[in-house]
A protein has these predicted regions:
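Partner-binding and oligomerization surfaces adjacent to conserved cores of proteins
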Residues: 1-298
């Protein structure tokens, strides 16, 4: 079956997922990493990005004048935040934007019920990840935009497998950056450095969160968006903010269990979910519907 991953959400979202299921697939909204999170979250991964950049620069023997790590250091040390504002704006305008759906390795977790499961009135959708493609280190750059990827979030660090892949991608782009300068000279060198730095952050930032969130044990389903592709980006309003998203489909066969939160009337909710599965010609015998074991009443 593979490892299990859990998505805490509301009853409203569950109804929408099941009602709109097509071709035995559930359609999730993958939100832009930059519109759903604190836009300065990428700074938490400063050391990781710096380490990758400096190792690539050492391997490629990059001169001090062309080093992108120098720009990253200047932005990090800028007390006025002017550099950070320029970088944030460039990230929003970047051609390659990461969109994510959040999961957790924790099943039936009280903190996650409170944070993401409508304070105990929602559901926890338990999926097997075996049909979700992981990162493929071979030929990753062309493939990264053609499929979805699942990986562990790091809290102050990242896993070695992701680190190795990100290292390869950054080195590939760094070579293109140096080749462009070799062919065209150092005109617009700042813009070229900023573009490569943005790419490094776009690759690394989705898997980095502040250590205070380590209790979530998050895994993220990631999809990159290219502006020139045929992917459609849409928008919704949440908490007085406008969030951009793109659609990601997960096979219904991945859904193994629906845990009903500790607060609702379990029998009533369970019967309704079973009826809905039948109405959508989905086999409820393949999906367990169970009650949360968390002793919590809001």
């Amino acid at each position: 079956m593979g490892d299990l991953i859990c998505h805490y959400t509301t009853l409203e979202v569950l109804l929408s997922l099941l009602r709109n299921a097509e071709d035995k697939k559930l359609t999730f909204w993958a939100s832009s990493i930059y519109s759903m999170n604190d836009p300065t979250e990428f700074m938490y991964g400063y050391d990781i990005c710096m380490d990758i950049l400096q190792k690539v620069e050492k391997r490629l023997k990059v001169s001090d004048k062309l080093k992108v790590s120098k720009l990253w250091m200047d932005i990090h040390d800028d007390s006025s935040n002017d550099w950070k504002e320029i970088l944030i704006q460039s990230l929003y305008e970047n051609n390659e934007c990461p969109f994510v759906v959040s999961f957790s390795k924790l099943k039936d977790s009280l903190p996650l019920w409170k944070m993401y499961g409508n304070n105990g009135y929602g559901v926890c959708l338990v999926f097997s990840e075996y049909l979700v493609k992981p990162f493929n280190p071979n030929g990753i750059e062309p493939q990264i935009y053609n499929s979805i990827h699942l990986y562990d979030v790091g809290y102050g660090t990242i896993h070695q497998s992701e680190y190795d892949i990100f290292n390869k991608i950054v080195e590939s782009r760094y070579k293109k950056y140096l080749s462009t300068i070799c062919q065209n000279g150092c005109n617009n060198i700042f813009e070229k450095k900023l573009s490569l730095l943005c790419l490094t952050l776009v690759i690394c930032s989705p898997c980095i969160k502040h250590p205070s969130y380590a209790y979530e044990q998050e895994k993220r389903l990631l999809k990159y968006y290219l502006k020139e592709s045929n992917q459609k980006v849409q928008f919704y309003e949440k908490n007085n903010n406008i969030i951009s998203y793109t659609e990601v489909q997960i096979p219904i066969d991945n859904l193994k269990e629906i845990i009903v939160g500790p607060c609702p009337d379990f029998q009533s909710i369970s019967r309704s979910i079973t009826q809905l599965l039948h109405s959508q010609e989905l086999n409820p015998q393949d999906i367990k519907i169970v009650q949360s074991e968390v002793p919590y009443r809001n």
